[in-house]
């Protein structure tokens, strides 16, 4: 931005063309905004480069940063020279555009790989044009808008960073990391641009701008006028660098700068002769905020309004416009902020002309204008000086900061600087600091300084953005100053009324709202400085007047004092001198060496003399204090008012102020003090200041009172010696002369602060701290100066300080330096707090209330100072100091009548708890419990008091009760892990940690923001401290991560956990609950918590979600969940049956113990983390053991209720609302888990885990209560499934932000819901008796808990109660079942509904299929006949057959998708086998559907889901196809059917009728080996949710099947499914289902125990198989087969669901029937020992548990049943045979396998006729055989059985296809257990893949 040319030295050389220079007479803002291109042209870039970017989805891929560049001093000086040379011409009145601040925009960051990166855009490139449109003159926001509004392509013209003059010149500033001083040697400093900055001699070195005197009529004016501007002739400003900090955002100002001059930028009070007075400042004056005392606004207005029209008629609105260019003000201004005349172009030409002489003053060697970079060791110094001269030392960064609203409440930009106090200490340009020494000081780039010294900024035309951001800098003057001015004026100083100086000029002090919004942003502290500065600048006219240096000495002293006074301003001595010069025409012009302090005092005094500056009002205005000739400076504040002058005036002032600015600095400092206690200052001023003339004549005399306050004489500008602490200009000048103790000398803020701290300490020791003193000691402006520089300053009464600030007069002198001096205490003046102005005496008592901003400033300074003080370098030391000062400040603030205006930036009651001691050791909650404290945030310290203190006399030492916490460089964040309390934030200092609890979140955030802002006041210290803390925190975190501790952050939890109960109680109450308890509930919780089982440190299992170690990327998600889910997603998405197959219990237990020990350093590469089944079981175990389940106990009933809503849309909406209402940890964890489960379900084709299967596994685990409510477990199981399934299916909708869109519901979901409301839990009742662990105890099968869950309920007591419950449930169930026997009751459970639904669908589908397949019809007919016969048999005992048939189907389905198959299979099978005739068409369809569901998921789909699938896609499948496809289940089919019938199915497989529930339950109980999943379910009192997919569906199916079986033959298929799934599920569910079955219903219900089961089994076996002699053998074989997976063969028959077989069924059905008959006979012959079968089942269950072998066994049983069903076609005789086979099934599996093998051989032979089918069958058989051979002999039997079953099923009902499904299921089950569901390739060779089975059977059938 050429405009910033000033920044670019070379370019800067080129004067901007007049065109580009917009007359400054116009608002600077306008100019800044209107940077003319000519300026741009002035730059000699190597040339910008053009970059074209294409907009991508994420945008253009780069971010910008905004810098406001202020013109180099040289440029300003050049313009000044031009003016001096008479070149003002048209532009004379206004600074050139190039001198205007320029908005520069740089590329902050380029996203790698983004469009910008590809286009070659680089970080640091400066944007010149956007789409061909120059950015010059545009605000940052406008440029951003241009970019954002560009089309798909964006053309940028950029200046590469390495070619950008601005960046080269301001390399450090541009990328300032704080305001770090340049650390390199001069040689390393980048060469300044070739442009040589002309050593412009400050023309108005004094910068004595004619002070505009407000009309005496104006109270302000009067006040101000009383003191003519002290034309403190500034010495050459060489080291003068005015750093005016921009106050933080206006809000800050309001917050902190309650003080005077609320005129933020909004109010630019222009001190204009009354005629010209424009209420610019007043308009701009920010009255907002307490800053404006009620009167304040008026004063500012008055100031503006009252500018003496007569006195300064010619002066433009700009108050102290440099009327006296001659005074050098103009010249100075350029150096000052470049404001010089340019800024004050508005000033009348005459004034401008006058300025030349001042310029000459500038010319003085010290003057900044001469600044030549070659004179400085480092470029940075040069820049700093130049900047000081020109911009008030504001760096770009500073300006940016201010623009950014100084996110940090850098109240004291300088305070941060104080850190630099060290040799390099960056001082806010204290006058002395400003000395070339400035090199020592941290150098800021000009822009930085600008930022620091908003005053200058204000005077500068702001860049467009700045303007937009802040009101004219001038406009805002220190509110504090203004306030105190006003107050002073109002109070004692109504006298402030503009006095007519002896010279007759009226001293009208226009208050400048010295602070721009930036100032405000910056913070009160800065403001005070700035304010002071502004005052000095603005008041220069006045302020200077008050302290007019009679000669250059005065001027110089004044300037210097100002500079020192204005901590922010680093003024070169010359510059400072110049500023005073502004006040004094003559003295200001004469660049005299600073007068001795006495001279200064003289200057301060010589109001009229200085005032005599050409601008009449300039002289007058300067005397803010109305010093009548009597020499009493009544109104120092007027100076401030002067500052308030309009922007133009401000410009002039700025120049003047630049000279004065330094002066002002001192003034400002004093002013800050004075602002703090305006009354004090006023009084002081009055006391101190004699008539301006008198003072002028006798500055010493005036200062004499100040003698106590020893102003240090600033080293000559040329001196490199560490600049003495900047004296407040007047005071220094005066005092120095007097040689009063240096104590009075104004130190840079740091020094002052140190001194102040020391004083405070002394006072504390003495117990007396005069508020005034404390103020005085506290540099208002945290002007960094080396503390060492600060000589022990005698306490400068705050009042003195204030006075000084108010009027350069050595008001300070008046105040006794002694800390105790009752000097008017500076009271904070709150806008409301006018009494702040109360008599000094009162104020003394009450630590003067400073205006809030003043106090804050002081406090900040103090605190910063403390921290910043070299001595305070150590945080602890600093803290101590802070404690002292802050306490003082805080007390003063406390004293302040109004808290709002108190020094505190924020205060209020907080609960507080210390986490660590000074040594960093953790403090237990019992030792340091939560306490309610009144917390006051002052500056960089927090004061903790037991209660709110309002006493005004606190300025003395902080009370013992008060605890001080230094927050410089602290880290503050929201605490989540340290306590369970809400709204807690943690404050970490260098050595301690504290927790604070706020009332609500907003309050907490407000505190955090305030503390962050106040803790960042000292750049260097803050940065260093923050770095230390951050590194410390990182170390802690790393330690925590590497150690076994689970705590992410050191947390008191561990200690609390180890505490005794009493201690826990004591600690827990404050720690965990908001104290004190508000109600009984709270007390109860408090009482309960200590006794609740506290998780061990770092515990993961069995602890609340919010206590679990958080994941690395989401603090709300437990680490274990994150790790397990990621591992499964990385490695297990293709693992068949993931989550269904349990892991090794021992491994799971071991990992749980390890994680519970707090080991969060998980090495996922470790072998133990390689077993996915263990990992999946670990995850399930975690959720099972949650004390508060994922869906929370509180909302459990709501979820169940919501799930049962009729309207699916309403249901989903309600569920979503409930989910959103979950606690954060629960919500985020649920969101994460459901997303993971959705990911798993998306891979269901490979892993066979459709949403329904996952829901079966996770439903009871996630949706549960902590209580062992078996009824809920059973009755709500379908709801639990459905809720989880819905979550998985609609994860995106549930967890998306947009909830407006209506959820999309599917038919199957709705049907499921419909089926859910009244789940039939009869089949679960037996399970309840058998198994029962509390949900918490329920463990994954892999976990040790699983055994417990299976083995027992838990403690004896619980067991007993459970038994009672179980017995009652059984009785109810038995009654129900009896009824069901009479008629098929569609149980409320989804299973039954699904079955019914499925049957309907099947019938439809089947009908369709028959149409498709001609063969199907015959088969269907046969199947129907079979089904009918089966029904009859089933009714009789043929149910077993039906069940078998169904089981085949079910197995096929259930194994592929266990949940659905039971239901689906049952109806289809019933339809096919039993009801074949009636449902001829349905059968094929059903088979197909079954095949689909089975093949799809590799597990049985629940019936309802299958039904829905069927409904969704009815189709005919060729037998082969069916065989393979049956397994493929639609996800939809899975969804609707949540059956808990896995055990039932198992029973069905065995022929649930034959096997009594007891037997089944026994088998299941014995089969504790049953899937861990099942055990999990059982343990939870829920159907086995664990690994076997079929468990629940089977249950549901079997229940339904039993009912249906009783009523229909459908039930058997479900039972088959159960079997396929595994005996365990069967056992659990089957007992009930079998009870439903007519035989066992009552008996089984009663008999839950193993004996009963065994008996029933035996009975069944006996009844079923008359020829069971072979049963034992068969049984053993079957057992082996089962163990090895023979069940697969059984499953296969089930898999041969008739739906698939429709086409073949006619043929195959008959064949199968024949075969079945034969096989039935064989089976009967093979073995009919039911007991053996039961044992086999048990074994199978065992296997099932690990593998789904049990299911396979059941599958075999199912196959038998299927054969029986096939036989039913032959007739009930066959059914009886089948029945016999059923008892034999377990053992007969082997025999059956053999039989099947034989049969297959025969079949194959017979079927060879159908070569292809036969071959296929043979291959299948062969495959089976191979697998069998691969596996032990048992496996081969199983294979045989598998083959047999398929054959059997095929012949009866085209079950060949289904059979493969079953087989697949069996395989899949085993696979599932082994995480391998692939039917074709099974982990167990003895298992045949579903496809193989299907093929073999198919061929056999053929």
Curated annotation (Swiss-Prot):
Biological-process GO terms, alphabetical: Golgi localization; signal transduction
UniProt-recorded name of the protein: Rho GTPase-activating protein 21-B
Principal cellular location given in the protein's record: Golgi
Compositionally biased tracts (Basic residues): 1737-1748
Residues annotated as domain Rho-GAP: 1103-1295
Chain intervals for the UniProt region annotation (Disordered): 1-44, 78-97, 284-317, 348-369, 409-450, 581-603, 613-632, 879-902, 1039-1095, 1306-1357, 1375-1394, 1494-1520, 1559-1704, 1729-1748, 1803-1890
Top-level taxonomy: Eukaryota, Metazoa, Chordata, Craniata, Vertebrata
Keywords assigned by UniProt, alphabetized: Cell junction, Cytoplasm, Cytoplasmic vesicle, Cytoskeleton, Golgi apparatus, GTPase activation, Membrane
Localization per record: Golgi apparatus membrane; Cell junction; Cytoplasmic vesicle membrane; Cytoplasm, Cytoskeleton
GO cellular component: a single term: anchoring junction
Function in brief: GTPase-activating protein (GAP) for rhoa and cdc42.
Residues under site feature: Arginine finger: 1140
Biased composition (Polar residues): 10-22, 409-424, 1039-1063, 1494-1511, 1614-1630, 1865-1878
Domain of life, source organism: Eukaryota
């Amino acid at each position: 931005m050429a405009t910033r040319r000033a920044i670019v030295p070379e370019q800067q050389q080129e004067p901007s063309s007049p065109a580009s220079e917009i007359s400054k007479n116009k608002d600077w803002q306008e100019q800044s905004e209107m940077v003319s291109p000519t300026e741009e042209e002035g730059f000699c870039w190597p040339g910008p480069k053009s970059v074209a970017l294409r907009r991508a989805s994420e945008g253009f891929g780069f971010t910008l940063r905004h810098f406001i560049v202020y013109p180099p001093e040289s440029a300003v000086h050049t313009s000044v020279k031009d003016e001096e040379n008479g070149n003002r011409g048209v532009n004379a009145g206004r600074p050139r555009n190039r001198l205007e601040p320029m908005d520069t925009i740089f590329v902050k960051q380029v996203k790698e790989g983004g469009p910008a990166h590809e286009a070659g855009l680089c970080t640091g490139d400066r944007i010149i044009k956007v789409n061909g449109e120059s950015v010059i003159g545009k605000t940052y926001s406008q440029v951003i808008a241009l970019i954002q509004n560009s089309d798909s392509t964006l053309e940028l013209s950029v200046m590469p960073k390495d070619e950008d003059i601005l960046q080269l010149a301001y390399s450090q500033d541009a990328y300032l990391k704080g305001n770090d001083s340049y650390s390199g040697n001069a040689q390393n400093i980048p060469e300044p641009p070739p442009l040589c900055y002309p050593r412009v001699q400050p023309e108005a070195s004094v910068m004595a701008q004619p002070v505009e005197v407000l009309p005496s009529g104006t109270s302000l004016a009067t006040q101000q006028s009383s003191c003519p501007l002290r034309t403190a002739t500034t010495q050459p400003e060489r080291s003068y660098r005015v750093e005016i900090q921009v106050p933080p955002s206006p809000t800050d100002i309001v917050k902190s700068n309650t003080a005077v001059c609320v005129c933020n930028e909004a109010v630019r009070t222009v001190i204009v002769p009354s005629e010209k007075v424009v209420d610019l400042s007043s308009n701009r004056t920010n009255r907002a905020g307490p800053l404006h005392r009620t009167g304040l606004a008026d004063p500012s207005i008055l100031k503006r309004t009252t500018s003496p029209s007569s006195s300064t008629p010619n002066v433009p609105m700009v108050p102290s416009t440099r009327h006296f260019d001659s005074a050098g003000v103009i010249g100075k201004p350029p150096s000052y902020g470049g404001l010089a005349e340019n800024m004050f172009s508005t000033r009348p030409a005459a004034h401008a002309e006058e300025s030349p002489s001042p310029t000459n003053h500038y010319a003085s060697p010290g003057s900044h204008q001469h600044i030549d970079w070659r004179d400085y060791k480092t470029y940075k110094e040069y820049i700093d000086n130049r900047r000081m001269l020109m911009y008030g030392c504001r760096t770009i960064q500073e300006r940016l900061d201010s623009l950014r609203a100084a996110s940090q409440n850098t109240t004291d930009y300088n305070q941060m600087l104080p850190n630099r106090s060290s040799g390099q200490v960056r001082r806010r340009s204290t006058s002395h600091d400003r000395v070339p020494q400035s090199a020592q000081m941290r150098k800021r780039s000009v822009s930085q300084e600008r930022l620091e010294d908003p005053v200058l900024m204000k005077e500068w035309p702001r860049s467009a953005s700045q303007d937009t951001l802040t009101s004219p800098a001038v406009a805002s003057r220190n509110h504090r100053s203004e306030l105190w001015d006003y107050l002073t004026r109002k109070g004692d100083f109504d006298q402030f009324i503009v006095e007519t100086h002896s010279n007759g000029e009226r001293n009208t002090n226009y208050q400048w709202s010295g602070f721009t919004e930036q100032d405000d942003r910056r913070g009160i502290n800065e403001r005070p400085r700035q304010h002071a500065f502004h005052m000095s600048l603005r008041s220069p006219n006045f302020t200077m007047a008050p302290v007019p240096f009679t000669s250059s000495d005065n001027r110089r002293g004044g300037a210097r004092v100002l500079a020192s006074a204005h901590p922010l301003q680093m003024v070169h001595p010359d510059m400072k001198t110049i500023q005073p010069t502004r006040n004094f025409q003559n003295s200001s012009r004469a660049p005299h060496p600073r007068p001795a302090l006495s001279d200064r005092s003289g200057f301060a005094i010589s109001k009229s003399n200085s005032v005599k500056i050409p601008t009449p009002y300039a002289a007058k205005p300067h005397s803010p204090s109305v010093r009548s000739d009597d020499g009493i400076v009544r109104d120092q504040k007027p100076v401030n008012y002067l500052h308030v002058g309009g922007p133009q005036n401000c410009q002039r002032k700025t120049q003047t102020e630049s000279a004065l600015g330094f002066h002002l600095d001192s003034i400002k400092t004093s002013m800050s003090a004075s602002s703090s206690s305006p009354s004090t200052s006023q009084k002081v001023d009055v006391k101190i200041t004699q008539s301006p003339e008198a003072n002028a004549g006798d500055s010493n005399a005036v200062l004499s009172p100040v003698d106590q306050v020893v102003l240090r004489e600033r080293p000559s500008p040329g001196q490199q010696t560490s600049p003495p602490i900047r004296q407040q200009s007047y005071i220094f000048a005066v005092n120095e002369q007097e040689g009063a103790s240096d104590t009075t000398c104004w130190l840079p803020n740091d020094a002052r602060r140190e001194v102040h701290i020391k004083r405070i300490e002394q006072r504390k020791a003495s117990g007396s701290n005069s508020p005034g003193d404390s103020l005085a000691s506290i540099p208002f402006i945290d002007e960094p100066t080396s503390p060492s520089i600060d000589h022990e300053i005698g306490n400068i009464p705050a009042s003195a300080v204030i006075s000084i600030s108010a009027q350069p007069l050595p008001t300070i002198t008046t105040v006794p330096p002694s800390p105790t001096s009752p000097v008017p205490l500076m009271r904070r003046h709150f806008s409301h707090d006018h009494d702040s102005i109360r008599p000094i005496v009162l104020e003394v008592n009450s630590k003067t209330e400073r205006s809030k901003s003043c106090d804050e400033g002081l406090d900040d300074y103090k605190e910063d100072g403390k921290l910043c003080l070299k001595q305070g370098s150590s945080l602890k030391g600093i803290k101590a100091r802070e404690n002292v000062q802050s306490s003082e400040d805080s007390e003063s603030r406390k004293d302040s009548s109004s808290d709002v205006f108190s020094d505190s930036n924020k205060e209020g009651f907080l609960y507080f708890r210390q986490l660590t001691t000074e040594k960093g050791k953790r403090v237990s909650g019992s030792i340091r419990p939560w306490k309610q404290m009144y917390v006051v945030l002052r500056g960089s310290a927090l004061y903790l008091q037991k209660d709110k203190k309002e006493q005004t006399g606190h300025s003395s030492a902080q009370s013992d009760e008060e605890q001080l916490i230094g927050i410089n460089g602290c880290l503050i964040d929201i605490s989540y892990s340290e306590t369970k309390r809400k709204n807690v934030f943690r404050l970490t200092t260098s050595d301690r940690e504290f927790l604070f609890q706020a009332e609500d979140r907003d309050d907490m955030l407000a505190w955090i923001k305030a503390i962050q802002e106040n803790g960042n006041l000292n750049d260097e210290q803050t940065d260093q401290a923050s770095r230390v803390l951050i590194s410390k925190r990182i170390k802690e975190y790393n330690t925590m991560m590497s150690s076994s501790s689970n705590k992410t952050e050191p947390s008191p939890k561990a200690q609390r956990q180890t505490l005794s109960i009493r201690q826990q109680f004591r600690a827990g109450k404050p720690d965990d609950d908001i104290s004190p308890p508000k109600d009984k509930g709270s007390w109860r919780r408090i009482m309960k918590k200590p006794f609740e089982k506290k998780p061990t440190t770092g515990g993961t299992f069995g602890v609340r979600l919010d206590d679990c170690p958080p994941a690395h990327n989401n603090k709300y998600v437990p680490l274990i969940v994150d790790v397990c889910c990621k591992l499964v997603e990385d490695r297990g998405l293709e693992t068949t049956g993931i989550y269904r197959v349990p892991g090794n219990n021992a491994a799971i237990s071991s990992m749980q113990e390890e994680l519970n020990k707090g080991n969060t350093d998980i090495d996922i590469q470790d072998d133990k983390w390689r077993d996915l089944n263990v990992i999946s079981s670990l995850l399930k175990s975690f959720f099972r053991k949650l004390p508060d389940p994922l869906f929370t106990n509180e909302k459990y009933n709501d979820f169940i209720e919501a799930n049962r809503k009729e309207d699916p849309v309403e249901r989903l909406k309600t569920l979503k609302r409930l989910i959103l209402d979950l606690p954060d940890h629960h919500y985020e964890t649920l969101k994460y888990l459901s997303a993971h489960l959705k990911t798993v379900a998306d891979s269901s084709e490979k892993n066979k885990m459709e949403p329904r299967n996952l829901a079966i596994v996770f439903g009871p685990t996630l949706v549960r209560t902590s209580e062992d409510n078996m009824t809920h477990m059973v009755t709500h199981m379908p709801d639990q499934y459905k809720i989880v399934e819905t979550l998985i299916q609609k994860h995106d909708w549930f967890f998306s932000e947009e909830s407006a869109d209506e959820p999309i519901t599917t038919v199957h979901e709705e049907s499921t819901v419909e089926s859910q409301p009244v789940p039939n839990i009869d089949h679960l009742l037996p399970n309840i008796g058998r198994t029962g662990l509390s949900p918490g105890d329920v463990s994954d099968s892999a976990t040790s808990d699983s055994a417990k869950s299976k083995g027992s309920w838990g403690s004896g007591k619980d067991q007993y109660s459970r038994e009672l419950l179980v017995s009652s449930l059984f009785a109810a169930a038995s009654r129900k079942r009896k009824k069901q026997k009479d008629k098929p009751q569609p149980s409320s459970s989804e299973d039954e509904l699904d079955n019914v639904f499925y049957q309907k669908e099947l019938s439809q589908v089947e009908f369709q299929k028959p149409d498709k397949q001609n063969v199907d019809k015959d088969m269907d007919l046969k199947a129907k006949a079979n089904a009918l016969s089966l029904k009859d048999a089933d009714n009789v005992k043929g149910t077993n057959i039906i069940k078998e048939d169904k089981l085949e189907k079910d197995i096929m389905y259930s194994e592929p998708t266990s949940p659905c198959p039971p239901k689906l299979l049952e109806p289809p099978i019933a339809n096919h086998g039993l009801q074949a005739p009636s449902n001829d068409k349905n059968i094929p369809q059903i088979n197909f559907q079954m095949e689909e569901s089975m093949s799809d998921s590799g597990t049985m789909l629940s019936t309802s889901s299958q039904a829905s699938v069927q409904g969704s896609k009815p189709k005919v499948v060729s037998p082969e196809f069916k065989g393979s496809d049956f397994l493929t289940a639609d996800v939809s089919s899975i969804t609707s059917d949540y059956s808990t019938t896995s055990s039932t199915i198992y029973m069905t497989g065995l022929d649930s009728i034959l096997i009594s529930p007891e037997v089944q339950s026994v088998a299941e109980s014995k089969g504790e080996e049953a899937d861990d999943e099942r055990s999990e379910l059982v343990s939870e009192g829920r159907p086995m949710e664990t690994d076997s997919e079929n468990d629940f569906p089977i249950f549901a199916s079997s229940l339904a099947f039993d009912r249906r079986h009783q009523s229909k033959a459908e039930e058997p298929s479900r039972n088959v499914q159960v079997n396929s799934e595994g005996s365990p599920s069967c056992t659990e569910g089957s007992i009930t289902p079998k009870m439903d079955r007519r035989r066992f219903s009552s008996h089984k219900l009663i008999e839950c125990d193993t004996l009963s089961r065994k008996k029933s089994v035996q009975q069944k076996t006996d009844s079923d198989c008359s020829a069971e002699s072979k049963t034992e053998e068969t049984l053993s074989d079957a057992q082996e087969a089962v163990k090895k997976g023979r069940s697969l063969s059984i499953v296969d028959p089930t898999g041969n669901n008739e739906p698939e077989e429709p086409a073949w069924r006619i043929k195959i059905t008959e064949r199968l029937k024949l075969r079945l008959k034969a096989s039935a006979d064989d089976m009967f012959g093979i073995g009919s020992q039911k007991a053996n079968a039961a044992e086999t089942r048990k074994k199978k269950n065992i296997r099932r548990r690990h593998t789904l072998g049990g299911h396979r066994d059941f599958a075999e049983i199912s196959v038998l049943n299927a054969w029986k069903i096939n036989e039913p076609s032959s007739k009930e005789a066959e059914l009886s045979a089948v029945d016999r086979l059923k008892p034999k099934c377990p053992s007969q599996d082997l025999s059956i396998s053999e039989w099947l093998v034989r049969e297959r051989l025969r079949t194959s032979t017979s079927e060879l006729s159908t070569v292809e089918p036969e071959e296929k069958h043979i291959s299948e058989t062969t495959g089976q055989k191979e697998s069998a051979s691969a596996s032990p002999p048992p496996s081969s039997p199983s294979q045989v059985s598998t083959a047999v079953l398929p054959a059997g099923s095929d012949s009866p009902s085209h079950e060949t296809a289904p059979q493969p499904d079953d087989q697949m299921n069996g395989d899949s089950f085993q696979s599932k257990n082994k995480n391998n569901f692939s039917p074709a390739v099974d982990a167990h060779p003895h298992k045949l893949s579903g496809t193989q089975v299907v093929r073999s059977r198919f061929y056999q059938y053929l």
